[in-house]
From Swiss-Prot:
Pathway: Isoprenoid biosynthesis; isopentenyl diphosphate biosynthesis via mevalonate pathway. It catalyses: (R)-5-phosphomevalonate = (2E)-3-methyl-5-phosphooxypent-2-enoate + H2O. Heterodimer composed of a large subunit (PMDh-L) and a small subunit (PMDh-S). Keywords: Isoprene biosynthesis, Lyase. Its EC number is 4.2.1.182. GO terms for biological process: isopentenyl diphosphate biosynthetic process, mevalonate pathway. It comes from the Archaea. Belongs to the AcnX type II small subunit family. It comes from Methanopyrus kandleri (strain AV19 / DSM 6324 / JCM 9639 / NBRC 100938). The active site is at S67 (proton acceptor). This is Phosphomevalonate dehydratase small subunit. One of its GO terms (molecular function) is hydro-lyase activity. InterPro entries: PMDh-S-like, PMDh-S-like_dom, PMDh_S.
Length: 135
């Protein structure tokens, strides 16, 4: 694993570094029906992260999917304190962008290296201002 920062494009940037454990998935995730906003747990039985809690972790995956209501699920998670510490995706789509903006959840996309392939669940990363991920 590299120790050099990976450059991404910040969609919702961090003001201060955020250090947290990573939760990695090779699948896109729908927040509506796929995540319980009360607990922060992935509840979609067809998703490889089913049973995992997103709370306080940096979620690394290809992107989001699903209903526009997913934006409000992310906002509710932020309000309840069950949101991820940050999200890093290959490509951010509008549902994810709106949810992260509303919930003030750090969102980085278009990493210069494929972090879905490079990182493993349990690794610790640091999100740095300007869209850098220290791995």
């Amino acid at each position: 694993m590299s120790v050099s920062p990976v450059r991404c494009e910040p969609v919702v940037d961090v003001e201060e570094p955020v250090e947290a454990e990573v939760l990695v998935s090779s699948q896109r995730l729908s927040f509506l029906g796929g995540v319980d906003p009360k607990t922060g747990e992935v509840v979609d039985p067809s998703h490889e992260l089913c049973g995992e809690k997103l709370t306080g972790r940096v979620l690394v995956l290809p992107g989001g999917r699903g209903s526009t209501v997913g934006s409000y699920v992310l906002m509710e998670m932020a309000d309840r304190g069950t949101a991820p510490a940050g999200i890093v995706v290959r490509e951010a789509e509008p549902i994810l962008v709106v949810g992260c903006v509303l919930g003030d959840i750090p969102l980085f996309h278009r990493p210069e290296r494929d972090l879905v392939e490079e990182l493993s669940t349990g690794d610790v990363v640091k999100l740095l201002p300007g869209g850098k991920v220290e791995v």
